[in-house]
């Protein structure tokens, strides 16, 4: 991710580099989300959004449309790194769309941090990046182990 990029470039004192060196796995958050019946699938973003969402979609026999403008980008980073970088220890989950607002409010109340809805699950079998409501042809992939 962006923190590793900073470290490799010799920028060791940036907030992104510090976050990379001192990850905070979201165990309590994962346990809480995993107990919610409106949450359908979940995993950490160790290999990046593009790769890890692909794993969820493959196992779920589903597709997704991801709104590029809704992906959170850390200060000092960029959209491609946010979508393809890994080792973030954040959680990626899918939930019932009719429960999303209530789930986000309950998460914020419990953990003091927001949930970022970035798209929707579709009946198709592909990941489609969207910009301004239109498909954006991007060949973005996260980390692959082999």
What residues fall within each predicted segment?
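Glycine-/charge-enriched secondary-structure boundary and capping motifs
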Residues: 12-15, 35-146
């Amino acid at each position: 991710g962006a923190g590793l990029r900073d470290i490799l470039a010799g920028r060791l004192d940036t907030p992104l580099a510090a976050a990379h060196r001192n990850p905070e796995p979201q165990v309590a958050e994962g346990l809480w989300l995993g107990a919610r019946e409106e949450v359908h699938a979940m995993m950490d973003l160790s290999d990046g959004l593009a790769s890890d969402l692909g794993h969820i979609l493959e196992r779920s026999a589903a597709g997704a449309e991801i709104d590029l403008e809704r992906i959170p980008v850390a200060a000092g980073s960029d959209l491609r790194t946010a979508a393809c970088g890994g080792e973030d220890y954040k959680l990626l989950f899918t939930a019932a769309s009719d429960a999303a607002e209530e789930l986000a409010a309950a998460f914020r109340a419990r953990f003091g941090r927001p949930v970022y809805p970035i798209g929707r699950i579709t009946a198709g079998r592909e990941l489609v990046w969207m910009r301004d409501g239109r498909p954006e042809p991007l060949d973005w992939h996260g980390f692959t182990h082999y």
